[in-house]
Amino acid sequence: MENILAVGKVPASLLERLLARAPVDDPSVLLGPGIGLDCAVVDAGRNLLVFKSDPITFATDELGSYLVRINANDIATTGAEPRWLLSTLLLPEGRTTPEMVEGIMGQIYAACRELNISVIGGHSEITYGLDRPIIVGSLIGEVPRNELITPKGARPGDRLLLTKGVPIEATAILAREFPERLSHELVPEELEQARNYLSDPGLGVLRDARIAVAAGRVTAMHDPTEGGLSTALWELAQASGRSLEIDPGKVPVPTLAARVCGVFGLDPLAAIASGALLLTVAAEDADRVRHALEEADIVCADLGVVAEGPAGVWQVTTAGRDELPCPAGDEIARVFGED
């Protein structure tokens, strides 16, 4: 029987085999492809260039804003500043209007102006076989060579912090794409609040990263996206070769987000989670970093600790220590599959 892959990220085991064969022979490539590595890094002389490419596939609303912020988040995890964007727009045949194209591009331009990013190129076309727009961004950032942070930097004893909570992005997408299914459980004001998770608490983590890095010794950062926090923890563990021990009860899940997930029967820890930033911080600096974020009105929780390898993620509670399951796909994909 043919093995058909589910919607979502390519399984880590397959991806790992594929990436192991990638030709990366240029000595200027300091960080190439790998599980849990948000960006590539290239030595450009005085500074390092950081590269990221990411699509928007689930959402159909505010696509341009999503695109810029999702790519900027990954650049932020390296301590770099996002600088230059290229975007590709694949638009559905028979549905695309000039107003649609202008709307998406206007959103991209507005988000780039807000983050001081220059749009330097890209591609757009009307494409056969699509039922909705698919857009892809490639973002380049810049960081001084002595300030680079990668997921490989997590060390035993570091504290594991999470900003804002989860799943911010899933909450916004579900409220925007399936309002009729939520209207039976949420009053109009709550539904509007869930829709506005796109901007409050927001999908961007560039500010979170800047504050954290300025406040203490951040050793690694990772951006939870598809597969949610659970997948992000596993990716960070694999990238660093460390074991992560968390208390699942410490994970901040906003009440409204939990209710939205409950309507669809989703695990909040396994749903797309842009807007949160996962950090490992030197133990002696963890309180200082957390307080700096909280003073900036950014929720920050201490989830647990980094331990020696081998790579793994463990839930530690009063009942004992169990391995945290790694999701096979993103919870939100099930909802789109039902629609």
Residue ranges and their predicted role:
Residues G8-T163, I168:
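Glycine-rich phosphate/pyrophosphate-binding loop regions near the starts of catalytic domains
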Residues G32-G34, V42-G45, T78, C112, ...:
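Solvent-exposed alpha-helices and their adjacent loops that cap or buttress functional pockets
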Residues S274-T280:
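A short beta-alpha structural unit
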